[in-house]
């Protein structure tokens, strides 16, 4: 790096060592250096690369559990442009696309029909991977309300009046329900407007009022109401349990149950606290406490903690998602990291 000279940096704590090592690596990465380790074991970094500081605090990613390539979006400078990056599974950039100025994508999902759905400041848009065309989708006017989630071939969104679950694999509508989102008194968000799909695509969950979540069976359209004012909902890998606000419920009946997970879940967390959970098969990636806390990789089948991922390029927050064989991270330091999860 520096002509073969060994440079000594004195540190008095492990935290300082991590910080110094990260800034030394980052200065190399800013010059275009890409760290790659194709033989990384489970939970080890396969790639770190600098993509650029992001003016977008959401750090969007779009992945699929059936493929290793993935998409990352970042806002450049003072909203001068928004750039979509397409990476392969080893972290090489396949292409970059300019989406245009004065945009901010909060979240994005990869659909099986070769499109991305983007939540651009509460407006849903469709991006074609073939033509690179961005077209309006679902809601035409910005009402400060949006839902967007994806699981398998299914995608869930909110039109402004209805929640829709659509199967892009077979091009069929699975479920649709008219709902009104209640205005919120919480300064962090304008409306109660949250929706998600379960890992095995048998259930959807949504929240449009203060004190309850509704679970929908996507085969029978039967509903179960969960009285809970908490945050950070997630399903178990087998769709049998729904957790929210640190409590656990049977999805079939809505009955409260004991924690079925090998990790504990904190109760009483607020909207802005951290509790992020991602699922791939029996694997669950869990981040709790703070946005800079390590991500734990659990195998719920065996109950084992497989790895703890403490990425050096997370300052305050990170977004992460599973691909077919990895966990990919988009960090607030402007880095993209890939960790091996090939079991």
Q: What is the predicted function of each stretch?
A:
Residues 315-343:
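Blade-level signature of beta-propeller repeat domains, shared across WD40, Kelch, NHL, RCC1
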Residues 43-53, 82-99, 122-139, 163-185, ...:
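Surface-exposed loop/turn elements that mediate protein-protein interactions on large endomembrane-trafficking
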């Amino acid at each position: 790096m520096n002509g073969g000279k060994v440079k000594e940096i004195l540190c008095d704590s492990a935290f300082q060592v991590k910080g110094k090592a990260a800034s030394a690596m980052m200065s190399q990465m800013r010059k275009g250096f890409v760290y790659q380790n194709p033989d990384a074991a489970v939970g080890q970094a396969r790639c770190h690369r600098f993509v650029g500081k992001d003016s977008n605090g959401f750090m969007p990613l779009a992945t699929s559990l059936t493929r290793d390539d993935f998409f990352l979006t970042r806002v450049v400078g003072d909203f001068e442009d928004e750039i979509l990056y397409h990476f392969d599974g080893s972290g090489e950039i396949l292409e970059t696309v300019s989406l245009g100025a004065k945009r901010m994508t909060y979240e994005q999902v990869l659909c099986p029909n070769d499109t991305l759905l983007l939540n651009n400041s509460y407006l849903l848009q469709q991006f074609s991977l073939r033509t690179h065309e961005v077209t309006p989708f679902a809601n035409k006017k910005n009402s400060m309300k949006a839902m967007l989630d994806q699981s398998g071939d299914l995608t869930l969104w909110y039109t402004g009046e209805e929640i829709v679950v659509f199967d892009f694999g077979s091009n069929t509508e699975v479920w649709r329900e008219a709902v009104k989102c209640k205005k919120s008194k919480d300064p962090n968000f304008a409306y109660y407007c949250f929706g998600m799909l379960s890992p095995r695509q048998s259930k959807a969950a949504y929240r449009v009022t203060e004190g309850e979540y509704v679970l929908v069976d996507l085969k029978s359209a039967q509903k179960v109401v969960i009285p809970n004012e908490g945050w950070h909902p997630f399903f178990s890998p087998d769709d049998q349990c729904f957790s929210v606000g640190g409590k656990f419920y049977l999805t079939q009946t809505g009955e409260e149950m004991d924690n079925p997970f090998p990790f504990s879940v904190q109760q009483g967390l607020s909207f802005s606290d951290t509790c992020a959970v991602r699922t791939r098969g029996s694997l669950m990636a869990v981040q709790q406490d703070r946005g800079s806390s390590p991500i734990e990789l659990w195998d719920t089948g065996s109950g084992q903690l497989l790895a703890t991922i403490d990425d050096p390029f997370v300052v305050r927050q990170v977004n992460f998602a599973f691909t077919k064989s990895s966990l990919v991270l988009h960090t607030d330091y402007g880095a993209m990291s890939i960790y091996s999860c090939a079991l």
